[in-house]
Every structure is written in C-alpha cells, then in structure tokens.
Amino acid sequence: MPKETKETKKYKVEDEFAKAEKTSFVHIPSIKLDTSTLANNFKSLNKNIIPSGKLDYDNDNNENNNNNNENKHIDKRPQLISKKDKRKQKKEAFLQKFNPSLKLQKKKQQDDDESNDGLGMGGVLSSIDLLKDSMKLQPKTKGPKLTNEKRKKMSLKEANQYKNVLSHPSFKANPFATLQEHLANSVALQNQKIKQEQDFKPNNNNNNRNKLKRK
C-alpha cells in the first residue's frame, strides 16, 4: 500500500471542498462582492434622509413608564360617603324645599321663559305649579260621600262649563292667556281661603281660653 504524502493529503482536502459545493438538492453559487460599487452608491444617497445624532429612545421609554405608573396609582373606585355627609345632604335638600328665595328664583326663571316663549306656555306652567303648591299646603278633609245622582249632575255641569269655555270669545282669541288668567285667579282664591282659615283658628283658640277663664 503506498504511503500518504503531503501532496496526496492536499488533493484529498480539495476534493472534499469541491464535493461540499455541490449537493443533490442545492447548488451553492459563488458570489464576488464588489466593494467599490457599494461605496459609490452610499455616497450618492441623500444625506437628509439619514438622521444625524443619536435618537434618545431611553427618555421616551422613561416618560411612558412614568405615565403608566401614575395611571396605576389613580383610584378609579367610587368614593364612599360617610353617614354624617349623607345626613348633611338630606338636611340641605329638605331645607331647599321650604326656602322662599329658591321659590322666587324659580318664579323669576319661569317669568323669563314666558317672555321668551311666543305662545306664553311658561306663564301657564308657572301658575299650574303655584296652584299645586297651594293645594299641597291646604289640609286634606274628607268630604261627604257622593251618590250616583250627584256624580251625574257634576259631570253634566263640568261638560257644560267646558263647552262654555271653548265657545268664549276671549278663549278663542288667545287661549293660553285666558288659561293663565284663570289659573292665577284660582291660586289667589285658594291662598285667600287658607289665610282665612289660619286667621280663624287663633280667634277660636282665644275665645275658648276666655270661656275657660270665666268658668
């Protein structure tokens, strides 16, 4: 068997590399890179496109992290109200119902709405509200029980009144103004009755006291 020399070993290495370049699946091409063409192309690029200086990515990331941390610390749960504050709110709401200054402001606002309203609906609504308030203040008393005949008479009477109102010339000319005047008059009558009843009660109490003293 012949001995292997340095030359035979060299040929074997070359053959192995030659075999590695060609496989049964892929042929690996040999590419030569021309550095001069790359350098020329790089010089021809527009320098304005390439950003100058360092981009400060770290500061942006730090700002975003700080904002996220601040949002995490914000408590989005509904705040609980103590019993003392609840009682205070209820008391204020109760006092506002009986505050005369608030009623005057409400009436003034309604008057302004009436002046702005072409049809005069604001005045009608304000007089309706006043009538409701006076009806609430009036003490409730149980009236006599109505029979069927009395109910029929009342319904006929109301139907006739309704027809008379519709046929009235002032109602035909300006129905909203007529309703407003009627409601204002009814409110004045209700207030007058309430005042008379309140004045009548102290007089009765004084008379009863005088009678007891005489006895």
Swiss-Prot record:
InterPro entries: Slx9-like. Keywords: Nucleus, Ribosome biogenesis. Pfam families: SLX9. One of its GO terms (cellular component) is 90S preribosome. The keyword Nucleus applies. Belongs to the SLX9 family. This is Putative ribosome biogenesis protein slx9-like. It comes from Dictyostelium discoideum (Social amoeba).
